[in-house]
Structure formats: C-alpha cells, structure tokens
Amino acid sequence: MFNQLSDEQKMLKKLALLSGIKPCTASSMLFSFPYSQQKLIDASTQKLFDLFGKLRNTDRLKFLIEEAIDRGIDIDVQDKDGFTLLHKSINERDYNIAGFLLERKANPNIHDRDIVTPLNRIAGKPLSKTEEDFHMAKLLLQKGALTEPTDFSGWTPIQYAVFNEKIGIVELLIDYGANLDIIVPKGFYKGKNLIELVRAISSIFSDQSLNKQLQTLLKLATACQNNDFGLVDYSVKKENSDTEDDSVTKEDIEKFINHKISIKPSVKLLPKYLKELIRLKGFLETKEEFIKDNTIKRLEDNINSKSSLKYLLLSKIVESPSLYKFDVGMPEDLKESLEEHGLKLVGDID
C-alpha cells in the first residue's frame, strides 16, 4: 500500500509519476532528466560554489561572496550544473545567504540545466514544508520571481506546490497572480487542472483535511479568477453534522475573504484583485446568510478602498508625490496603503 511507504519511497514514486512512468515497473528505477546548455566558470569562482554545504559560518560565506563581487564576479554566474549562487543557497536551504544574494540583485529567474528556477526548486521539494520555505518563496516573489516558469516536466511552481501539499505556497502564488488554469502537459497526470490534480492525489495525502483545504482554496480562487462559481459546490453546514464532503462552507468562504482583504496587491495586480473581489461579492449577494451578516459590507468597504488606491496610484500623483498632500477626509487605511507603495504626500496641492 502507498501509505505504508517511507517518505523517501513516496518521493521517488511521486517523481516517477511526474515523469510519466507507471509505478512498480523496472523503468521506474531508471528515469532521468534532460540537461540544458552548461556554462563554465573559472577555478577561483568554482571554489566559492564548493563552499556551499561545507562552510557553516554564514558571516564568513557572506564575506567571501562580497569579496568575489568586489573582484568583479557576476553574481549570476553559473557553474557546470547551471547553478547560480542563489541556486546553491536554495538547494542547501541556506536561506540566510539566499536573502543576502537577493538583496544584492541576484536574478531569481535563471534556471539550471534541468530548467529549474529557485522558486520551482522550493515548490518541488517533496519533503520540505517549513515556515522557512514559505518565507523564502515569498521573498523570491517580492524580488521579481516569475510565477509561471516551467521545468523539464513542463510543471510550474503552483503545480508542484499543490502536488507536494504546500498550501501556504499555493496561497502565496495565487496572491501573486499565478495561472490557475494550468494543465499538466505530460506524464501520469496529463490533462489535469489544479483541482483535478488535488483530487487525483487525495489517496497520497496523509492528512485528508489538508487535501480538502487545498480543494476549497483552489475552487474559490479559480471561481473568482474565471467568474465561474459553478465550481463552488456551496452548502450551508448543518449544526451537529459530522458528515465530511467536498462542499464549500460559509466558514470556508469567510476564511478566504479574510485572507483576500489582508493582502496588499501590487499596482500591477490591483485590477485583477478588484475584479475578482467584485465577482465574489456578486456571488455572495445571491446567498441570504451573507446578506444578513456584514460580510458583503466588508467586501464593499475593501473594494472601495482598493479602488481609490488604484485611482491614486495610476494618477499624476505617482509622478510627483512630493507636490501633493493628503486630503483631510482621506481614510487612514488609504493613507497607509499609499505609504506602503512608497508615496508620501507632503506637498501643498489638494
């Protein structure tokens, strides 16, 4: 039985499935990955790469990297495996060094010879589900990591995050606008979208409640993205009911809304964010229980606030923020949002 396998065996079986190899066959032990073009580096730089995983003194490693940069080394140079210094730090889970490199403008979108980016790598590690992984993925996205790079299997980060039960990273990628209509291009799960993928691997999950949480998150997020609320098999949960099913409850929707309201989308993602909230509000207005409480009002308030923010961020204020001043009646949350986007209005123009 699959559930009786060790974590390492589960990981190997998952990798075999991703590569299109049927489990329990001789070929499942011999799958390999294609390589991309290699880039060679000089011997002194190779020594720096070799220190990863060996030198445990983080400050010393930072010093050596700084010294190499001062000598003129390209921070994005690649070794024979296509790894950059950022790749090496991610592979070794040395996230302190990874953050250090990103602050020095390391490119988060370079792929190695297996066409794997740092974000692909974090999402694709089957046995690594820590807070550190989540925060590293978040930092990569904040520093410009793309959400849609495909690796040797044609998988994107969100597909790997779903497959590996990393619900925090799935939610993070949704916040950053990841494509939720992505289809598995080949292999055992060929043709499946994200929701179908979660259902297909439900027997692999040791925690079935986590599988349901993933399904619920993807149903709601995809419904908002595509304005297709037929995906949301909503039901009012009856008190004292112990029945477990795949339906989306009022509590699920409220949790989803709370998260959506809490995030601070970039200027680029604001239009998409607003469109999705307006669609969700329209869906909830057909449900009496949401009309009775303040859920819809909370959505309306957030939509109005973010719409005002969008208007200001796309106006002439952005060109010369120092010339303008805050309107006396401007809500505090809007003032804070402007300042979070780097706009301090201290001038004389209303």
From Swiss-Prot:
Q: Where do the ANK repeat units fall?
A: 81-110, 114-151, 153-182
- Spell out the SMART domains in the cross-references: ANK
Lineage: superkingdom: Bacteria
Keyword vocabulary terms for this entry: ANK repeat, Repeat
- InterPro entries membership: Ankyrin_rpt, Ankyrin_rpt-contain_sf
User: Which PANTHER family does the record match to this protein?
Assistant: ANKYRIN REPEAT AND PROTEIN KINASE DOMAIN-CONTAINING PROTEIN, ANKYRIN REPEAT-CONTAINING PROTEIN-RELATED
Please identify the protein, giving its name as recorded: Putative ankyrin repeat protein RBE_0589
Lineage of origin? Bacteria, Pseudomonadati, Pseudomonadota, Alphaproteobacteria, Rickettsiales
